[in-house]
Design a protein with these regions (language model features):
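Regulatory, non-catalytic segments
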Residues: 106-121
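Short Lys/Arg-enriched helix C-cap and helix-to-coil transition segments
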Residues: 122-129
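…primarily DNA-binding HTH/wHTH and HhH modules…
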Residues: 132-163
Length: 163
């Protein structure tokens, strides 16, 4: 599907969205998805769950229904991803802030690893995490895309720092 930030691949189960990735190359993205879910049956349809998730990329969120996620990860990863969901639109936070927020202040690097393993791009807003120095830091789908997302969200409202 198309998004303001490029092609996006969305995969869902009957429980919710399990994967959402930016896909510069369709075949490579699909092969990556097949490796992550080797026992899955794939169909090339956009269902209601996926269509609803695409509303996140519109300026009008009035049509957006609750988005259900079906995530698989370690307890630590799930805790980090849950914390990412608390960062407001237009907000930024640091790996250290997240580590403190999950009561593990020395786990900055582990937080960075968990952020990098986020399976649901944009919906779990790992792009809102920056380095303590103010630098953007790494982003799985590229620094240019991360910059564009932060700018797009900032245009929707006031930029905030912290959780």
């Amino acid at each position: 599907a198309k998004s303001p930030f490029g092609e996006i691949f969305i995969a869902s189960t009957d429980k919710g969205i399990c994967c959402m990735e930016f896909a510069d190359e369709h075949d490579a993205a699909f092969n990556s998805l097949r490796k992550k879910f080797p026992n899955a049956k794939f169909t090339s349809i956009v269902d209601e769950v996926q269509q609803n998730a695409l509303f996140i990329f519109t300026q009008d969120w009035s049509k957006l229904k609750e988005i259900k996620l079906h995530l698989k990860g370690t307890d630590f990863q799930l805790k980090v991803w849950e914390t990412l969901l608390k960062i407001p639109v237009g907000g930024l936070t640091t790996y250290g802030d997240i580590a403190v927020g999950i009561n593990n202040p020395r786990a900055c690097r582990a937080v960075g690893t968990a952020v990098g393993e986020n399976p649901v791009a944009f919906l779990i807003p790992c792009h809102r995490v920056i380095r303590a120095s103010g630098e953007l830091g790494n982003y799985h789908w590229g620094e240019i895309r991360k910059t564009a997302m932060i700018g797009w969200e900032a245009a929707k409202g006031e930029v905030k720092r912290g959780l």
